[in-house]
Amino acid sequence: MENSQMWLLWGALSVALFFYFSTLRRRYAGGKPLPPGPTPLPLIGNLHLVGGGTFHHKLRDLARVHGPVMTLKLGLATNVVISSREAAIEAYTKYDRHLAARATPDTFRACGFADRSMVFIPSSDPQWKALRGIHASHVFTPRVLAAVRPIRERKVGDLIAYLRAHAGEEVLVGHAMYTGILNMVSFSYFSVDIVDMGSQMARELREVVDDIILVVGKPNVSDFYPFLRPLDLQGLRRWTTKRFNRVFSIMGDIIDRRLAHIRDNKPRHDDFLDSILELMAAGKIDRVNVLNMLFEAFVAGADTMALTLEWVMAELLKNPSVMAKARAELRDVLGDKEIVEEADAARLPYLQAVLKEAMRLHPVGALLLPHFAMEDGVEVGGYAVPKGSTVLFNAWAIMRDAAAWERPDEFVPERFVERTPQLDFRGKDVEFMPFGSGRRLCPGLPLAERVVPFILASMLHTFEWELPGGMTAEELDVSEKFKTANVLAVPLKAVPVLIK
């Protein structure tokens, strides 16, 4: 047994060394050079340079030394990191199609999820085009979003009611936002209240989804050394497989109950699930597609919107003059109106600017989702991006590029009010790309740009907000921590004070 294990170890080391020296030869081969970067060490590459600290900060610091287009070896995996507006514009305008595939973390290969998920399927795959079209024309259309608006308004009302019940008390802002938005997403998609519903199924679904969100952020040796992927040495794929199976079982039960509801000719719910099941009945998608779409809504939608709101509230508490200005706009526009409606947010340009500025400074997806170079021929900044490499857009660094922004590290919402033409969330102006850009723009954007400003307006219109325990704005810690997303290093606690 010991001899066989020793041979396995030597075999793995031999393969690793082969890949390492092959990479060095390629770096100095003919044609366009690879982007500059720190010299990789045998086996580990540059992993020693990015361990500890905040990952996107580390990448920015390395880019200051090696340039805005940089090669980074993480184990045996070649990464090209793009950290400036100019380089990002070149990549998206010239090579969006070439870079529109995804680098797939091994965890998401569990249950074959990545092979059927719109998040990870290459954009050249007909299946991706079909799923993207379904989202654009059947899930996030103005008609469908308008039909579900009463649900969103009711669930935001529930969130405000929760905060009213805890007025004058210290609350964890991120937890309150996540709970409220998870309820809203679950009810909008399939009319199930995940948090308050007393069923074991609802509680278990939330717990399992939370577990999956945590595990996907763990460093995985299978991603750094792809030849070890079949061994799943850390067991993360096996662990995730069990959770995926449980999630899909629970969601499958929800689908079956809805199908029975339809067969019995009971009234429609007019939620997203009704729309999706109509497509399944027409043969445009299958059950696995439906399960994946529902799962993606939970993992990506609820968590991202909740973290965004936590960040904007942190910056408002850090900058009380900005909060006062945003609340003054609410009074001017809404007057004595007690309850904010979703449509009101469009009439609040300064509040929209506050939100955009918080997302510029603290994008939840600081590195977006990794892209993957499917073919040779991509050149950015005069350097070759090799086929098979992972391409990381450091959106956090790009949106703090001094070539694009004055005082890039300061919280100045006025920059979005004064700018002409106005910057939107769609990433056409690459210096502001919190939802990505190009073909892989976040498909949930139409929902997020309605929900997040609506919740923010409701929170500021109903409550004054204070820091707990006599903490001053200067003492509030708004430093960042990178997990699966860019989060506050110290979760935000605040006190909602009901406006009389």
From Swiss-Prot:
According to its UniProt record, which cofactors does this protein need?
A: heme
Gene that codes for this?
CYP76M8
The main enzyme category here is: oxidoreductase
Q: Keywords assigned by UniProt?
A: Heme, Iron, Membrane, Metal-binding, Monooxygenase, Oxidoreductase, Plant defense, Transmembrane, Transmembrane helix
User: Keyword Iron on this protein?
Assistant: yes
Task: List the InterPro entries hit by this protein, alphabetically.
Answer: Cyt_P450, Cyt_P450_CS, Cyt_P450_E_grp-I, Cyt_P450_sf
Question: Which PROSITE patterns does the protein's record reference?
Answer: CYTOCHROME_P450
Topology of the protein relative to the lipid bilayer: Single-pass membrane protein
Q: Which GO terms describe its biological process?
A: defense response; diterpene phytoalexin biosynthetic process; diterpenoid biosynthetic process
> Which organism's genome codes for this protein?
Oryza sativa subsp. japonica
**Protein name stated in the entry:** Oryzalexin D synthase
- What are the subcellular locations of this protein? Membrane
- Write out the GO MF terms: 3alpha-hydroxy-ent-sandaracopimardiene 7-beta-monooxygenase activity; ent-cassa-12,15-diene 11-hydroxylase activity; heme binding; iron ion binding; monooxygenase activity; oxidoreductase activity, acting on paired donors, with incorporation or reduction of molecular oxygen, NAD(P)H as one donor, and incorporation of one atom of oxygen
